[in-house]
A protein has these predicted regions:
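Gly/Ala-rich beta-loop-alpha elbow adjacent to hydrolase catalytic centers
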Residues: 94-98, 102
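Conserved HGGG/HGGXW glycine-rich cap/lid loop of the alpha/beta-hydrolase fold
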Residues: 15, 20-70
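Flexible "cap/lid" loop of the alpha/beta hydrolase fold
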Residues: 107, 112-143
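Acidic catalytic loop of the alpha/beta-hydrolase fold
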Residues: 208-212, 237
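Conserved alpha/beta-hydrolase catalytic His-Asp/Glu region
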Residues: 129, 144-195
Length: 259
């Protein structure tokens, strides 16, 4: 399989897309707000069903759109997104590409951060390729067909609706930006930062993830021994294919947290 096909399938101007639903009041025993960092596409448009499922549990939700211009490495993105983190209590949730980005942000100890959720993600390159391979992600390479991406990302859980959402998400972002982010996944390594995470952490793993190299998943589990690790039946795009189940896990875990 071409390297670009392996990488791009992991998964505008800076902005925030949000969906709100009234939750519990400030006297609640646990945080009620979830701030989401989306996957490789960076738009958050693929996450609408999952955010709606969280809202059904009485939570408020917000998805940050990753900036499409400028450096796309995780450290640079973390610096640019820092000012968008709220001062009130919140849970930071990140999937796939944004996992290392969330780690970068969490270890800077935001005032309102009360917990971290990492879904279908990694601490360093998620495929068995050397970091130097990032230079081979030529801008001239074409994007893989949506049908192929859907098979890799969603497997037997793919539907026409999923394929339509995936197609719409990909056309919103410049191809060069997708390639830059894919290259960043080969260079990133936040393993040394994991021990600096000071908030409760939940890790959601997909049992049928065709994108993440199994050793990278095992490594994350080993380096976060105090986190709650939950494996769900589903593909790499776990939050899209199993939105209700994933939201239920997140909501139940959040109820165990201190204010």
């Amino acid at each position: 399989m071409p390297m670009w096909v392996m990488l791009v399938s992991k998964g505008g101007d800076m902005g925030i897309g949000s969906e709100e639903k009234p939750g519990c009041d400030s006297a609640s025993a646990a945080p009620q707000h979830v701030l989401m960092l989306p996957g490789l596409d960076g738009s958050g448009s693929l996450s609408t069903p999952f955010l709606s499922a969280l809202q059904a549990h009485g939570l408020t939700t917000q998805a940050i759109t990753l900036p499409a211009q400028g450096g796309q490495d995780h450290a640079t993105l973390a610096q640019r997104l820092w000012s968008q983190l709220p001062g009130h209590p919140f849970i930071l949730l990140a999937e796939s590409f944004s996992g290392p980005l969330a780690v970068e942000l969490a270890t800077r100890h935001p005032t309102g951060l009360r917990g971290l959720v990492l879904a279908s993600t990694f601490a360093r390159r998620p495929v068995p390729l050397p970091a130097a391979s990032a230079a081979l992600l030529s801008p001239a390479w074409p994007l893989p067909p949506v049908a192929l991406l859907a098979r890799l990302l969603l497997g037997r859980w793919r539907t026409r609706e999923h394929m339509s959402m995936l197609r719409d998400a990909l056309v919103q972002i410049p191809a060069i930006t997708l390639r830059q982010r894919a290259a960043a996944t080969l260079r990133v390594d936040v393993r040394a930062l994991l021990s600096a995470i000071e908030v409760p952490t939940l890790c959601l793993h997909a049992c049928h993830d065709r994108l993440l190299w199994p050793p990278s998943v095992a490594e994350l589990q080993a380096l976060l021994p105090d986190a709650r690790h939950v494996s769900l039946e589903g593909p790499h795009l776990l939050l899209q294919a199993r939105a209700d189940a994933a939201a239920a896990e997140v909501a139940a875990w959040m109820r165990t947290l201190s204010p």
